[in-house]
Amino acid sequence: MAEIEELNDQMKVRREKMENLREAGIDPFGHKFTRTHNSQELHEAYDEKTKEELHELALSGIVAGRLMTKRGKGKVGFAHLQDREGQIQLYVRKDEVGEENYEIFKKADLGDFLGVEGEIMKTDMGELSIKAKKLTFLSKALRPLPEKFHGLTDTETRYRKRYLDLISNKESFNRFVTRSKIISEIRRYMDGRGYLEVETPVLNNEAGGAAARPFYTHHNSLDIDMALRIATELHLKRLIVGGMEKVYELGRVFRNEGMDMTHNPEFTTMESYEAYADFEDIMDLTEGIFQHVAKTVVGQDVLEYDGKEINVGGKFKRVHMVDAIKEVAGVDFWPEMTFEEATALAKEHDIHVEKHFTSVGHIINEFFEKYVEETLIQPTFVFGHPKEISPLAKMNEKDPRFTDRFELFINGKEYANAFSELNDPIDQLERFEAQAKAKELGDDEATGVDYDYVEALEHGMPPTGGLGIGIDRLVMLFTGTTSIRDVLLFPTMK
């Protein structure tokens, strides 16, 4: 907890003004205030009207917001109030509002909240304004705002004190409004296709559903250690067993791993599961989600991102992982080979072989991550991941070395992960046990055995297609943002 700092001169003056308001019988931290308009509604309705037309109409309005600018001398003043939608100018005359109201205006500081009732008008300069008739003091700001005209420029302060960033940086404010709209549209898209939105536990006895290191905590009442979820997958698939058929969850997951421009320890995912579907159906669903967001939120398929044009319209490219490696690195993993042969290839291509690697599949994945990922700029579905790195995915019928799984890559980064779900409980148990062995050999991201989930599968789960999308990265793409911290209202800070 931050310590209370010593008051500077500005803060002392603001507290004096707070006491002056109280002495005048005015509550410096007011109560409910009813508006007739926000700033956007006023601009949309009246920006096209002339000064004379507005005078003829003699319309009145009631607005409220934070005082962002104030100027004027003597008996006339101008100011701008800022609400969620933007700003509206105030025109305040002492002979219109009276002595008491004009004193409120004169003594108001930037950052204070005011409610204003008055006539909707235009000034001689043509700016839409409210000519004040009555002012109501709503809240005293005891600290000054950051830089008046240039916004908040210190990056760390923007992240630690996001409220100041939102007040002073309209671009940042709009980015988070866009984030909310994106999430709403994803919900609308899924709901419209018959999916049920559900909620599953954040605290779990066993962290599963992804290859990641979890955060641990202790449940005092039950006296057991628990893990914060690293994915929502296993509980959602239990609901498929239970007959819910089409489910999704939008929520936070937690991974105790590194932080960089595209990773934060807590982040938002959307996972969905659909009975009787396979991974190719889920490719279509994924395309649909991205294209729906493009159409409804940003209004275009071609996005400017990281100095590149990304086209999310039409069919996304689809390529098998082995073919992608062959094309980029010139190494062919289609012919069957021993682990020793694959290890030799890895050393030839400067790929480190971890001690928990036990199969060719691990080597294939390392080749892909080192040589291929960064080349995938336009939306690309990479499918056919090795079985060893896909413990929850169904094996491919034609080549059981690989799975019916895909990842969506854009600009060299993963945006989605999906597969035809493994629904054979015997195979699932064997893969869990292989993961547990890898964990013993030092693989921090390997999971343990979730016997309860295996038991659920033993009751029968229909063929199912599942999807996971990283919402934060999706928002980054659609807002042209290259740092994940700029799309998280309160990113993790030391």
UniProtKB/Swiss-Prot annotation:
Query: Where along the chain is Mg(2+) 1 bound?
Result: E407, E414
The record's section on SUPFAM superfamilies has: Class II aaRS and biotin synthetases, Nucleic acid-binding proteins
EC main group: ligase
Cofactor list: Mg(2+)
Indicate where this protein is primarily found.
cytoplasm
Q: What is its EC number?
A: 6.1.1.6
Q: Which reaction(s) are listed as its catalytic activity?
A: tRNA(Lys) + L-lysine + ATP = L-lysyl-tRNA(Lys) + AMP + diphosphate
Q: How is the cofactor bound?
A: Binds 3 Mg(2+) ions per subunit.
Which amino acid positions bind Mg(2+) 2, per UniProt?
Answer: E414
UniProt GO molecular function: ATP binding; catalytic activity, acting on a protein; lysine-tRNA ligase activity; magnesium ion binding; transferase activity; tRNA binding
Q: Which keywords belong to this entry?
A: Aminoacyl-tRNA synthetase, ATP-binding, Cytoplasm, Ligase, Magnesium, Metal-binding, Nucleotide-binding, Protein biosynthesis
Superkingdom in the source lineage: Bacteria
One cellular component term (GO) for this entry is: cytosol
Q: What processes does the entry annotate via GO biological process terms? A: lysyl-tRNA aminoacylation
Which InterPro entries is this protein grouped with?
A: Aa-tRNA-synt_II, aa-tRNA-synth_II, aa-tRNA-synth_II/BPL/LPL, Lys-tRNA-ligase_II, Lys-tRNA-ligase_II_N, Lys-tRNA-synth_II_C, NA-bd_OB-fold, NA-bd_OB_tRNA
Q: What is its subcellular localisation? A: Cytoplasm
Q: How does it assemble?
A: Homodimer.
- Of which family is this protein a member? Belongs to the class-II aminoacyl-tRNA synthetase family.
State the protein's name: Lysine--tRNA ligase
Please spell out the taxonomic lineage of the organism that makes this protein: Bacteria, Bacillati, Bacillota, Bacilli, Lactobacillales
